[in-house]
From Swiss-Prot:
Site feature Important for substrate specificity, where: 192
GO-annotated biological processes: L-methionine biosynthetic process from homoserine via O-succinyl-L-homoserine and cystathionine
Name the UniProt record assigns to this protein: Homoserine O-acetyltransferase
Keyword field contains Transferase: yes
Length: 308
């Protein structure tokens, strides 16, 4: 069954053109089932591109999903029109009374700031605490993952000497994990960040389990079983051209940037890159959504009750 999003959302047409099944409100009502409620807290500047990336992966599930777009209230977006935000987004204040089966918190290009210097950090802390009681499973991505693991466990981030940028081989450290069901032992994942968290700090925290890691780029995915929380520090959701877009943006702006590692064929930026992570991205999101379906309470109001 497909993902339910407004048919006027730009992602609707984009996903239809890719063959991803999407449905309107009218179609969803005909199916007499409870759809999974999944929210997306979109912190990225280009919100439309991120909507498409996440909806593509969530919408590939055979389960019916109602996808809600959420934004922080105390921050004015510079790269997305106010009309788009008013049409398709709700602030967290407007949805905090709700319960969600799943909730995704994206990255944001603010990783070089101290957390406490982020303009919406106070609201971010409230949102993270809220996910403990109002969300069955939270998927935190890149900066969102670093912020969450710092907020809940004090795990620090470290600034890198140069940007971690490219497509790197990663290892499956826990083949028996439900989130890695069907994964190869070794697979490619896009990386784009100026900071990192370190294994030594994570290992100090009980109940945090490292599921994916790169010998070059370090920790990629951490699972916290007690609250069904996932920390994904890299970008399995990226489009084929996402790293190229970032590279050419910086080149044209005169910002020093190395060519992304293991990305352009023959290291030639004139040759379109090949996507070598798409299948594992779909597998990861499919496993996450399947685990939601298997373990979430049927009654939404029961979500989080055991954590109170």
């Amino acid at each position: 069954m497909p993902i339910k999003i407004p048919d006027t959302l730009p992602a609707f047409e984009a996903l239809q053109n890719e063959g991803v099944r999407v449905m309107t409100e009218t179609m969803a009502i005909r199916q007499d089932i409870r759809p999974l409620q999944i929210g997306l807290l979109n912190l990225m500047p280009n919100k439309i591109k991120t909507e498409v990336q996440m909806a593509r992966l969530v919408g590939a599930s055979p389960l019916q999903v109602e996808f809600s777009l959420v934004r922080v209230g105390g921050h004015k977006a510079k790269n997305t029109s106010e009309e788009h935000l008013l049409s398709f987004y709700q602030t967290w204040e407007e949805v905090k009374h709700r319960k969600f089966d799943g909730f995704i918190i994206t990255g944001a290009p603010i990783e070089l700031l101290e957390y406490e210097d982020v303009t919406y950090w106070d609201e971010m802390k409230q949102i993270l605490d809220w996910t403990t009681t109002n969300v069955h499973s939270t998927l935190n991505v890149c900066w969102g993952a670093m912020a969450a693991i710092y907020h809940f466990h004090g795990v620090p981030k470290y600034t890198l000497k140069e940007k971690a940028f490219g497509v790197y081989r990663h290892q499956n450290l826990k083949p028996s994990s439900v989130y890695l069901n069907g994964f190869s032992d070794d697979f490619a994942v896009p990386v784009s960040r100026w900071t990192e968290v370190r294994r030594a700090d994570i290992e100090k925290v009980p109940n945090l389990e490292i599921l994916m890691e790169s010998s070059e780029m370090g920790v990629c995915l951490v699972h916290e079983q007690a609250c069904n929380r996932l920390y994904m520090f890299n970008h399995v959701e990226y489009d084929s051209t996402s790293l190229a877009d970032e590279y050419f943006r910086d080149v044209h702006a005169g910002v020093p940037i190395k060519m992304p590692h293991n990305y352009f064929p023959h290291n030639d930026p004139e040759i379109p890159p090949q996507n070598r992570w798409r299948s594992h991205a779909h597998l990861f999101f499919g496993n996450w959504i399947n685990e939601l379906y298997q373990t979430t309470p049927y009654d939404l109001e029961d979500i989080g009750e055991e954590r109170l």
